[in-house]
C-alpha cells in the first residue's frame, strides 16, 4: 500500500487527538448495537441486552480500548500493516472464528465515531485517508482467512 505524505499527515495528525478509551468504547458499543449478530463473539461480556446495557458495560469499554489501541499500531506502522496484524489475524481466524466482514463493519463504525468527535477536522480528504486505512487494516486482519 502506498501512502502519500498528505495521507500520512491526515492520519497521524488526527490520531494524536483521539481519546483511545472513549472512541474505542463507543466504536465497539456501536458495532454491538447496530449489528447485534456480532454480540455472539462477546458472550463472556455479560449483559448486552440493550443499548443502555452495552454502553454501560465495563468489558465492552475495556475491549473497545484494546481494539483501538491495536489500531494505533497500524498508525505507527503504516508501511507494514500486514505484518503488524499477522498474529491478530491468526487469533481471530483460527481461535475466535470471527467473520472477517466484521472487521470492515468496525472500520466503517470507527469512521462514524471519528467524524462525530472531530467534525470540523474530519474533512473529506481526512475521511478518504482514514477510509483507506480502515480498509487496509480490515484486509490485514482477514489475511489468514484466505
UniProtKB/Swiss-Prot annotation:
Involved in oxygen transport from the lung to the various peripheral tissues. It comes from Anser anser anser (Western greylag goose). GO terms for molecular function: haptoglobin binding; heme binding; metal ion binding; organic acid binding; oxygen binding; oxygen carrier activity; peroxidase activity. InterPro entries: Globin (IPR000971), Globin-like_sf (IPR009050), Globin/Proto (IPR012292), Hemoglobin_b (IPR002337), Hemoglobin_oxygen_transport (IPR050056). Pfam families: Globin (PF00042). Red blood cells. GO terms for biological process: hydrogen peroxide catabolic process. Residues 2-146 form the Globin domain. Coiled coil: none annotated. The keyword Coiled coil does not apply. Heme b binds at residues 63, 92. SUPFAM superfamilies: Globin-like. This is Hemoglobin subunit beta. It comes from the Eukaryota. GO terms for cellular component: blood microparticle; haptoglobin-hemoglobin complex; hemoglobin complex. Belongs to the globin family. Heterotetramer of two alpha chains and two beta chains. The gene is HBB. Keywords: Heme, Iron, Metal-binding, Oxygen transport, Transport.
Amino acid at each position: 500500500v502506498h501512502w502519500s505524505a498528505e495521507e500520512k499527515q491526515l492520519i497521524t495528525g488526527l490520531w494524536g487527538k483521539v481519546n483511545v478509551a472513549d472512541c474505542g468504547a463507543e466504536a465497539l458499543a456501536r458495532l454491538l448495537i447496530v449489528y447485534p449478530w456480532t454480540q455472539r463473539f462477546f458472550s463472556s461480556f455479560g449483559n448486552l441486552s440493550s443499548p443502555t446495557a452495552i454502553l454501560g458495560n465495563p468489558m465492552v469499554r475495556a475491549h473497545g480500548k484494546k481494539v483501538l489501541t491495536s489500531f494505533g499500531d497500524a498508525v505507527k506502522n503504516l508501511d507494514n500493516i500486514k505484518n503488524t496484524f499477522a498474529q491478530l489475524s491468526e487469533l481471530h481466524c483460527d481461535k475466535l472464528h470471527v467473520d472477517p466482514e466484521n472487521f470492515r463493519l468496525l472500520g466503517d463504525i470507527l469512521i462514524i465515531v471519528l467524524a462525530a468527535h472531530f467534525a470540523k477536522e474530519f474533512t473529506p480528504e481526512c475521511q478518504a485517508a482514514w477510509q483507506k486505512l480502515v480498509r487496509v487494516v480490515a484486509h490485514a486482519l482477514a489475511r489468514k482467512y484466505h
